[in-house]
């Protein structure tokens, strides 16, 4: 089924608002950051572009330090959605149609972004790489993503689907990150 296929050559990672002053108050933040880092390492290995947004950085700070090295392009915003002219121009310039979304908060910025892009892009959200302050808000958003026909998977599913097989140098690197 085409809906469930991922293609690293047609993929962009959209890292939404994992920022210094926001991450500490998010549910399961360390778990989410660790899984997000594994996905971003996969993106680096396979040359998948990473677009990062920062929500009101004056108040919420920069992207958390451990993820900054993976950023390809960074866009600041005050809107909750990432469907902004600058971001959309970058996505169109890259020319890929699958957008994998990671970040926060699931029920606000992640939700509005997926809702606003789902008609034009294949949207994929990684359930273990998104979070909110309250788990109930995250779970409500995840249920809505499924209703929107957004593909909801986890980081291991994505990584192993892209790897396809064991034994490669990439497998050895990435399998260590997700243990």
Residues covered by each model-derived region:
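A short alpha/beta connector and helix-capping loop motif
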Residues: 8-11, 26-57
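Active-site-adjacent betaalpha module
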Residues: 2-12, 58-179
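Short acidic, Gly/Ser-rich segments with clustered Asp/Glu that frequently serve as metal-coordination loops
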Residues: 20-24
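N-terminal nucleotide-binding beta1-loop-alpha1 segment
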Residues: 12-18
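A cross-domain feature marking catalytic cores of carbohydrate-active enzymes
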Residues: 18, 52-55, 127
């Amino acid at each position: 089924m085409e809906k469930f296929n991922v293609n690293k050559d047609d993929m962009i990672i959209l890292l939404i608002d994992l920022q210094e002053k926001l991450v500490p108050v998010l549910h399961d933040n360390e778990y989410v950051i660790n899984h997000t880092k594994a996905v971003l390492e996969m993106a680096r290995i396979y040359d998948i572009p990473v677009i990062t947004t920062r929500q009101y950085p004056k108040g919420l700070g920069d992207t958390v330090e451990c993820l900054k090295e993976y950023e390809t392009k960074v866009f600041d915003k005050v809107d909750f959605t990432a469907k902004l002219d600058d971001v959309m121009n970058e996505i169109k310039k890259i020319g890929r149609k699958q957008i994998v979304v990671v970040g926060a908060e699931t029920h606000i910025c992640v939700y509005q972004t997926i809702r606003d892009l789902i008609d034009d892009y294949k949207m994929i959200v990684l359930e273990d790489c998104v979070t909110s302050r309250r788990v109930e808000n995250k779970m409500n958003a995840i249920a809505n993503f499924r209703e929107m026909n957004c593909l909801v998977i986890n980081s291991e599913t994505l990584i192993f689907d892209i790897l396809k097989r064991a034994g490669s140098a990439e497998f050895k690197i990435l399998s260590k990150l997700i243990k």
